[in-house]
Amino acid sequence: MKKQNNLRSLAAQAVEQVVEQGQSLSNVLPPLQQKVADKDKALLQELCFGVLRTLSQLEWLINKLMSRPMTGKQRTVHYLIMVGFYQLLYTRVPPHAALAETVEGAVSIKRPQLKGLINGVLRQFQRQQETLLNEFATSDARFLHPGWLVKRLQNAYPTQWQRIIDANNQRPPMWLRVNRTHHTRDGWLGLLEDAGMKGYPHPDYPDAVRLETPAPVHALPGFAEGWVTVQDASAQGCAVFLAPQNGEHILDLCAAPGGKTTHILEVAPEADVLAVDIDEQRLSRVYDNLKRLGMKATVKQGDGRYPAQWCGEQQFDRILLDAPCSATGVIRRHPDIKWLRRDRDIAELAQLQAEILDAVWPRLKPGGTLVYATCSVLPEENRDQIKTFLQRTPDAALSETGTPDQPGQQNLPGGEEGDGFFYAKLIKK
């Protein structure tokens, strides 16, 4: 492999772009994976996800072992050392290989003069590992979350916050959605077993299957033919609560990447679905999903606050609003969220959610259903949001999900092994 494609240096660059520049790992990682051999793509992903999952610990270790931080053009070396720590702590990479490859990464980022420094810090960590980890276990950094988020979780969930944090720090399971227009869930589970894999049905969501061991999608029976889709169990709750019917006009708002759009069409293949998202680039994923599953929907780019721009005066029988949110319920799946979000974002997101709710509610027919959903666990975006909406919207009534004082259903991450998710089902009087 060429030196500029050193795996450890690429991982360090990816993490730096997330933490220092606020870029999403889902945007940063794919181009870097193109620079390495196919056999190394999984390791590069593991290093990036792992470092971001344990960033608080790795930062704490650097502060203990280095007298001053790396800054300026040497900043990538800071993250390269983190990659070294992560390998020594959490991977099966032999320590000598982890050290050698990480030190060599300095050449790839044009800092060969710092090879000795990197080697020295990593070896010092090896010598002091037990003492350092014992001290870390009593530090504030042990939660592996930014302090502002820990405080919010403690306030919202006085008896459950530790469980939420622990779930966020785990690797996520792989959930699938069986396409009921092709197979029953039990029938597809039989095909999965024939392929040498095992899956488990979800007790509440009728299409959901959890793989015993995550697998590449090309190994799943009928994936290319649209028999099955990768989608977390909690996300599948949206279509369950929406309960779409054939012949209805249905709006899926904030629809990208299209997992919920296609689930609606699996449940009601003859529904007339309009899928709208503000992000034109992400809409390409909606088209891809519709094509793979052989489905049709109208897809438009648009801002949820201004429905007249993308649907005129049209009204809908059902609306799914998967609102823009903090994504604090899917941290185990996207650990970069912890470092991309800021405390001040929550109030701004809650304001945006309220504006979208108020804008689309008039587009719901009398007697129609709106399901408000987020992948957040924060009350400001969920129960508080719906409580204030009900107070200012006299023709809105809660259905099935919670009570007026505690509206909606809040799934916490790890519950039945799904992600953190919130749903509120509203009926127009």
UniProtKB/Swiss-Prot annotation:
Catalytic activity: cytidine(967) in 16S rRNA + S-adenosyl-L-methionine = 5-methylcytidine(967) in 16S rRNA + S-adenosyl-L-homocysteine + H(+)
Ligand binding (S-adenosyl-L-methionine): C254, A255, A256, P257, G258, G259, K260, D277, D303, D322
GO cellular component, one term: cytosol
Function: Specifically methylates the cytosine at position 967 (m5C967) of 16S rRNA.
Native organism: Salmonella paratyphi C (strain RKS4594)
Listed GO biological process terms: regulation of DNA-templated transcription; rRNA base methylation
Keywords, ordered alphabetically: Cytoplasm, Methyltransferase, RNA-binding, rRNA processing, S-adenosyl-L-methionine, Transferase
A Pfam family: Methyltr_RsmB-F
Family: Belongs to the class I-like SAM-binding methyltransferase superfamily. RsmB/NOP family.
Protein's recorded name: Ribosomal RNA small subunit methyltransferase B
Documented EC number(s): 2.1.1.176
Domain of life: Bacteria
Region (Disordered), start-end ranges: 397-419
Main location: cytoplasm
Protein location: Cytoplasm
